[in-house]
Amino acid sequence: MSWQEKINAALDARRAADALRRRYPVAQGAGRWLVADDRQYLNFSSNDYLGLSHHPQIIRAWKQGAEQFGIGSGGSGHVSGYSVVHQALEEELAEWLGYSRALLFISGFAANQAVIAAMMAKEDRIVADRLSHASLLEAASLSPSQLRRFTHNDVAHLARLLASPCPGQQLVVTEGVFSMDGDSAPLAEIQQVTQQHNGWLMVDDAHGTGVIGEQGRGSCWLQKVKPELLVVTFGKGFGVSGAAVLCSSTVADYLLQFARHLIYSTSMPPAQAQALRASLAVIRRDEGDARREKLVSLIARFRAGVQDLPFTLADSCSAIQPLIVGDNSRALQLAEKLRQQGCWVTAIRPPTVPAGTARLRLTLTAAHEMQDIDRLLEVLHGNG
């Protein structure tokens, strides 16, 4: 089989399964509204959970940062790309979340890959929730360590896997809020079992940070858990992009030496770090509380109105509200019907989710209004 035949076969298989991914160029897509092909849609596919991507204070901070520092960082943080504003953001994140140190990364994917690649050796073991994000599972699969997966949120299964002999160290990996189901991990129970077996815990709280807990401190703070490694991202609750790893001073020093994604990547623009500082300020103050409270009300309105639809509603109290349809083709058709009626919704299919669980991944944001939720419910009931 030639290279082209190999590529064609893979694409043909995706097409046959109604699983071929496509991108749609949009003129506007992060907030309440999405604009595509000169048409405006109510946007129920954005991860901008607090509606901060268009916040004037954050936009102004980015502009001021660009005027002061330029539009790029100019290099890796180990060379010349680590500015005083990067340092200030790291210090503010560490203080906010109760850690000694924070290290900035260009994306959550890069942060997860960097930590696992740097920390794990051949004699070690990763025990990961089966539904962990692709960045975590791919990094675990590529690492020299042994990978074992436990049934989703099944602490008893996790305990059995941890109890089997391991010549090295054990790292338990999970998410705070799961990206495709919207449910939360039982972090306190997971941490207890992990500590009983002398392991470390790594939590990716991409979808909880900024959105839940006191001052938006996320899933771990809400459940009174402090993992050894906490990954937070800035493309969801913060409304920007990028990520950070929260850890001890010693672990931070170690990652600065051995995390290749950190060492060999151009750091985020200082202007972006300036915008993230402004976003963090909004998240922590009363305005952040008001946005979180509004989001909770919108979620409650949606869940109350969707109960009698002929779809499986995930057990989620988060901004992620999946309607599990099952069949790939049916999920695509339903998403298209909703778009025709002015609601932009994305169909998520395998391999992103398990086979037979194709779904509409609906996301609500504080930028929405109650009438937006009512319109979504009206359209769903008309196509249920």
Swiss-Prot record:
Task: Locate the residues binding pyridoxal 5'-phosphate.
Answer: 108-109, 179, 207, 233
Disulfide pairs here are none
Which GO-annotated molecular functions does the record name?
8-amino-7-oxononanoate synthase activity; pyridoxal phosphate binding
| Top-level taxon of the source organism | Bacteria
Instruction: Please give the residue positions where the record annotates the modification N6-(pyridoxal phosphate)lysine.
Output: 236
Question: What PROSITE patterns does the annotation carry?
Answer: AA_TRANSFER_CLASS_2
Keyword Transferase on entry: yes
What are the recorded Gene Ontology BP terms? biotin biosynthetic process
What's the cofactor? pyridoxal 5'-phosphate
Provide the top EC class: transferase
Q: In which pathway does it act?
A: Cofactor biosynthesis; biotin biosynthesis
> Which InterPro entries does the UniProt record give?
Aminotrans_II_pyridoxalP_BS, Aminotransferase_I/II_large, AON_synthase_class-II, AONS_Archaea/Proteobacteria, AONS_Proteobacteria, PyrdxlP-dep_Trfase, PyrdxlP-dep_Trfase_major, PyrdxlP-dep_Trfase_small
Q: Which UniProt keywords apply?
A: Biotin biosynthesis, Pyridoxal phosphate, Transferase
Per its record, the protein catalyses: 6-carboxyhexanoyl-[ACP] + L-alanine + H(+) = (8S)-8-amino-7-oxononanoate + holo-[ACP] + CO2
Q: What is its EC number?
A: 2.3.1.47
Specify which residues bind substrate according to the UniProt entry for this protein: 21, 133, 352
Q: Which family does it belong to?
A: Belongs to the class-II pyridoxal-phosphate-dependent aminotransferase family. BioF subfamily.
This protein's assembly is summarised as: Homodimer.
Q: Which HAMAP family match?
A: BioF_aminotrans_2
- Write out the function statement from the record: Catalyzes the decarboxylative condensation of pimeloyl-[acyl-carrier protein] and L-alanine to produce 8-amino-7-oxononanoate (AON), [acyl-carrier protein], and carbon dioxide.
**What is the name of this protein?**
8-amino-7-oxononanoate synthase
Q: Which organism is it from?
A: Shigella flexneri
